[in-house]
């Protein structure tokens, strides 16, 4: 059956850096540890032949995707899909996490992590994101039985994918870690998350 490899880009901060909530308006490159994560992903998938590769316009996803497909002779062209761009965190964009929590509260952040309910002020069209993921899965049904496609995005976007697949693990944590991936298998019109939050 066909597979989609859903990857979250590597780190944009290293140990000792002030970590901020980096959204779609903040275009940071991968940090040193993020580049190492991209290399680890590339090595892990070195024997995987991707028939298609997609990412957002953001540097961090492009760098991660290019590392992963750059290992392959005859690799597919990297296609930018705007919907894969990280969400806009509104007034919390690029703010330190303690300031974000102080503004929205722990309960709002937990609702975002648990069921993807956007906090007040974040510019997130959850229904539209679910619909575009659903459309992508429908298109993926046309892949060949042995085909594998790569999709590199950000955590705020990937978290809406589990809402539209047909089958997923009961204990799935929708948050993808940096440099981690999930696997969606497509069998006809049925989609199934078989793995999530894996790292090399």
Task: Give the residues covered by each predicted segment.
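Phosphate-coordination/substrate-recognition cap region in phosphate-metabolizing enzymes
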Residues: 40-109
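Glycine-rich phosphate-binding loop signature in dinucleotide/nucleotide-binding domains
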Residues: 47-49, 140-147
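Active-site signature of alpha/beta-hydrolase-fold catalytic machinery across serine-
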Residues: 67, 160-164
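Short glycine/proline- and acidic residue-enriched helix-loop micro-motifs
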Residues: 106-128
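Domain-level recognition of soluble alpha/beta enzyme cores
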Residues: 168-192
